[in-house]
């Protein structure tokens, strides 16, 4: 499977709630460059992060909108949707839907496993959609 296919497979596994299967796509020395407060670094922290998201948003879906390979890296623009059904970062369940944009950049090793991740997630939009942060005026 090429790197773009592996990226799509990662989203599919997460959509199925298969965090362990997702973890199998990550190298043991995986480096996460996105801060995950309160979680272990690396592969185990990333798996804990997605378990936390699935507990709070059981219908979490990540839809790849663009997947762009370049050498040993893949950039994906994606959309995350779900319904807030469980506690999330101290926020009690609201029953509200989220629909946010994200960008993932993954560097793969010669063995086809993900070695590094950089990501951008529109957490402000998510907090506004959950009603935690008021929506501002249009820009």
Where are these regions (language model features)?
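C-terminal and inter-domain tail/linker signature
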Residues: 1-139
